[in-house]
């Protein structure tokens, strides 16, 4: 997630669900109730979180400003300074040059062409 925020020079909010046990998804039948052991390889045991969360808020420089929120339900909040977006794009503007007609031009050849098949 940090690389997406950094390369896009944007604030990134990643909201990830938290689910403490598999029965909430209707998968309780794959856990052996007697032993609490998983019946499928790779499935968490009855004591493990089914989905552990991981929500996070990241600034345009790739720095985590809130989170990650792991192993619990909750709400992440952060004060953001939107001026950081413009500041961060001074040294890397991933799409800005496409908006300049003097620098970038896209040409599509729409004429039909003969197709050659070779063996």
Curated annotation (Swiss-Prot):
SUPFAM superfamilies: Carbon-nitrogen hydrolase. Coiled coil: none annotated. The active site is at residue 21. InterPro entries: C-N_Hydrolase, C-N_Hydrolase_sf, Nitrilases_CHs. One of its GO terms (molecular function) is catalytic activity. Gene3D superfamilies: Carbon-nitrogen hydrolase (3.60.110.10). Pfam families: CN_hydrolase (PF00795). GO terms for biological process: autophagy of mitochondrion; macroautophagy. It comes from the Eukaryota. Residues 1-82 form the CN hydrolase domain. Belongs to the carbon-nitrogen hydrolase superfamily. Nitrilase family. PANTHER family: CN HYDROLASE DOMAIN-CONTAINING PROTEIN, NITRILASE. This is Putative nitrilase-like protein YIL165C.
